Amino acid sequence: MFLGPWPFSRLLSWFAISSRLSGQHGLPSSKFLRCLCLLALLPLLRWGQALPYKIGVIGPWTCDPFFSKALPEVAAALAIERISRDKTFDRSYSFEYVILNEDCQTSKALASFISHQQMASGFVGPANPGFCEAASLLGTSWDKGIFSWACVNHELDNKHSFPTFSRTLPSPIRVLVTVMKYFQWAHAGVISSDEDIWMHTANRVSSALRSQGLPVGVVLTSGRDSQSIQKALQQIRQADRIRIIIMCMHSALIGGETQTHFLELAHDLKMTDGTYVFVPYDVLLYSLPYKHSPYQVLRNNPKLREAYDAVLTITVESHEKTFYEAYAEAAARGEIPEKPDSNQVSPLFGTIYNSIYFIAQAMNNAMKKNGRASAASLVQHSRNMQFYGFNQLIKTDSNGNGISEYVILDTNGKEWELRGTYTVDMETELLRFRGTPIHFPGGRPTSADAKCWFAERKICQGGIDPALAMMVCFALLIALLSINGFAYFIRRRINKIQLIKGPNRILLTLEDVTFINPHFGSKRGSRASVSFQIISEVQSGRSPRLSFSSGSLTPATYENSNIAIYEGDWVWLKKFPPGDFGDIKSIKSSASDVFEMMKDLRHENVNPLLGFFYDSGMFAIVSEFCSRRSLEDILTNDDVKLDWMFKSSLLLDLIKGMKYLHHREFIHGRLKSRNCVVDGRFVLKVTDYGFNDILEMLRLSEEEPSEEELLWTAPELLRAPGGIRLGSFAGDVYSFAIIMQEVMVRGAPFCMMDLPAKEIIDRLKMPPPVYRPVVSPEYAPAECLQLMKQCWAEASEQRPTFDEIFNQFKTFNKGKKTNIIDSMLRMLEQYSSNLEDLIRERTEELEIEKQKTEKLLTQMLPLSVAESLKKGCTVEPEGFDLVTLYFSDIVGFTTISAMSEPIEVVDLLNDLYTLFDAIIGSHDVYKVETIGDAYMVASGLPKRNGSRHAAEIANMSLDILSSVGTFKMRHMPEVPVRIRIGLHSGPVVAGVVGLTMPRYCLFGDTVNTASRMESTGLPYRIHVSLSTVTILQTLSEGYEVELRGRTELKGKGTEETFWLVGKKGFTKPLPVPPPVGKDGQVGHGLQPAEIAAFQRRKAERQLVRNKP
């Protein structure tokens, strides 16, 4: 390939010696001999120079549109150009490239590859893995390197058999196996589209997976029609235990229709519900953009978006910038000629670029070390390289193969952006979690296979016999149930003994409790004259204690007191009606059964059960005593001031307590404000739960409740026999609504209705109409009133659950805690945070105003000029060698203005120029200014666009002229609006003029000439100068012009001008210009006949106004 300098020094030495000998001895044939030596040296001298290394980029560029969108010629040219500018490369050699086409059929592709032998020094490719092995053998025979990103066979990694082959990317099979091993997915299926390249890819992939010991259930080929795809999907469903489906076809994200149709039909067949994982194969071969890169194909296709939730996209990681960003930067720097936008280019562009840079780096290493390079030495010197490719870091391992990082991308079935979930480190073959979990359909990963599939030196046989497995599972189930039943029986016996005897007993007697102060014997202390205070002794390091007034510990009996001391704490006894409780043993057994259900109820807003009192014929529930008494007492105590935050805190405590009880399947059945107690920390707790269950357990009949007691009971329970005692979940919600009414108005249930309780109960039982309390909006926020009405809905199924009530109630306080202590602290903190909130609010307002100002500034001035002005920099004038200007005005504008009101003139110009502004938005032009009826536009500045400026202005002019033909004035619809348009191309200077209301202005003779072209034009015509016509003709886009002749231009003399009358392919209708008079001109104003209709209509309106 390259020869070092050592042969030439010996030959030159020999040549000098022969010359001296011939001079000494006068040999006649020495001259002839020297000539022969020179002729022999010429080719060697030619080889001794730094000949270019020609890289052949081989692929199916002409037979597959998706491969042609990779723009291999542009990618190769960009890589060669950057290599030539890279100062780190040895300058003793250079690179060239040639684009070589693979045949579309694999059977013929090898033959075409052989024909390329003499066309390149080394090859990037092939892209078809079907003949990689044969191509690598030929490369070894030719001593030419094969650098491929697509080859699958792991045998190619054997450098003894294939010394001239190297991978520019990690083996796709290594990447797949690394991911499959991590998730324990062994059983795979491979499906390909019916293109020849993908069929051979699928066969190679399946063979490679099987060589790794993994079971590949099916290898299928599908056409693009629905019937073929459905048949393939049915075969996959019938295959045994397939977990992962590898799709060898073009990705749906870059326009692959086959994969799109395949995933849509899989979604219809419920195969994207998490049973299978779909993995696109082609994205393993390039870096698919995902950061800030939404995919419109997912946005516009809801079915595909939902199906893509089951797809894991594994692609080359791009750390700093995506492929689209790197391509756009190269295009902006002018390194890429005019080509499609980056989102229309295949990311395979970057892989081709990286492969060429890969060869250049290897060549550079070889030449620096040895001064020469062969194909085998290139592969050898590609080991342990590291360089930055097109948009990612490229690294190689000790064998010279690429070890780039990959990333696993995922969606949640609702978004159209991909998110990175795991990094696949191919250097260690490990996965690193990136913080965002994979969203699997159904909420859990696809079922894993046995670990033996990925264990070395182990053989998996595919599982045990199903019948044997069922027998084993059944036997284990019987054994497990037997063990659990025996354990449950033992546990019940032990618990029963412990609950009746010992420290955990729940059946209490007079020996366990001490009753105090007979004045506490009224209802739950609601009307008790308890006098106590909480004295905090935090400073002394002791816990708070209760201090009582003298005489508060007067001895009492169980007959006249409900308060007692149990284990040093105050407790409340809820007494049951007198009755026959039976034998003490039955009481013990029943108490044990009930406590099994109630002992685990531990919640901040549920008053805990401490046990049952049974002695001297009395049975009672023992619970904690709450010093603040019941909610009913607090509401009726005028000394307690309650704001809405205080009320909402109490209600939220009640909601949380009832939510907890309902989660534990406990129906309260007796929920009232007097059954809600408040402790010393103003924490509300629900009590008396389970009372009805205990009545049923003891088979006791309850006294008939009074009408006042029934005001909290739901209507359906009032109407149902025995409903009051049974209760229901929906009935508890209704009772909560009545308590809400009590808290809001601080009054009894239905206190505003002014009716006796009995009549209220009768109306509740017999609707219509539905009878409910009436609460004024001034008592609570509208959201709370609405929630209360939902809770007391007549139909029980329409009432919300406490989970829904809790979620709604949280939003009323905007997520703030409603605990009383927290509320007090928040009030104190609010003063200190007010200033911060005010500053933040003002800062946000300032930022919004700044954005508005910047937006207005960029609408008035070019972006680059606006940025300079914002930075306080001086905007230097800028010269433009060639731009095209557009001028237009309204024919007869003076006459129209004279016949119109000022506001009508403003409306006319606003309507017309709004229409123009909408049109220029679709062209590469810049609106300079409007003065009166004059409209000025330029193209080619401030952003240069080559020679396109004339075409952009011409296209815009045709669009404007077409739109004006149908434009009507609001106040003069009968009068036509005609415009004259003038176009001219030439140099201008642009700059910002003035400090007050600065404007971006254009200067130069081109501006004057363009204005003259407009003023000398005719209505409904586009007057074009020779310079503009010349540019349009060079563009060869089919513009139709007519020669006007020589025209007198003020200050310019006479010049030859033209009319622009259309363009090939332009189908919009153009207005017909007025006829030209005998003098070759038309009027520059409105004709009397044109305004006669308007004058006649105006006179008629005046007559109507003057009529009495």
From Swiss-Prot:
One of its GO terms (cellular component) is rod photoreceptor outer segment. SMART domains: CYCc. One of its GO terms (biological process) is cGMP-mediated signaling. The keyword DNA repair does not apply. Disruption phenotype: Deficient mice exhibit normal retinal morphology. Electroretinography shows slower recovery of rod from intense illumination. GUCY2F and GUCY2E double knockout mice does not show any photoresponse at 4 weeks of age, rods and cones degenerate at about 2 month of age and the intracellular transport of some phototransduction proteins is impaired. Residues 532-812 form the Protein kinase domain. Residues 884-1014 form the Guanylate cyclase domain. Its EC number is 4.6.1.2. Activated by GUCA1B when free calcium ions concentration is low, and inhibited by GUCA1B when free calcium ions concentration is high. Inhibited by RD3. Residues 51-469 are extracellular. It is found in: Membrane; Photoreceptor outer segment membrane. Retina. GO terms for molecular function: ATP binding; GTP binding; guanylate cyclase activity; identical protein binding; protein kinase activity; protein-containing complex binding. Residues 1-50 form the signal peptide. Keywords: Cell projection, cGMP biosynthesis, Disulfide bond, GTP-binding, Lyase, Membrane, Nucleotide-binding, Sensory transduction, Signal, Transmembrane, Transmembrane helix, Vision. It is a single-pass type I membrane protein. It catalyses: GTP = 3',5'-cyclic GMP + diphosphate. Disulfide bonds join C104-C132. It is an enzyme of class 4 (lyase). Responsible for the synthesis of cyclic GMP (cGMP) in rods and cones of photoreceptors. Plays an essential role in phototransduction, by mediating cGMP replenishment. May also participate in the trafficking of membrane-asociated proteins to the photoreceptor outer segment membrane. Belongs to the adenylyl cyclase class-4/guanylyl cyclase family. Homodimer. Interacts with RD3; promotes the exit of GUCY2F from the endoplasmic reticulum and its trafficking to the photoreceptor outer segments. This is Retinal guanylyl cyclase 2.
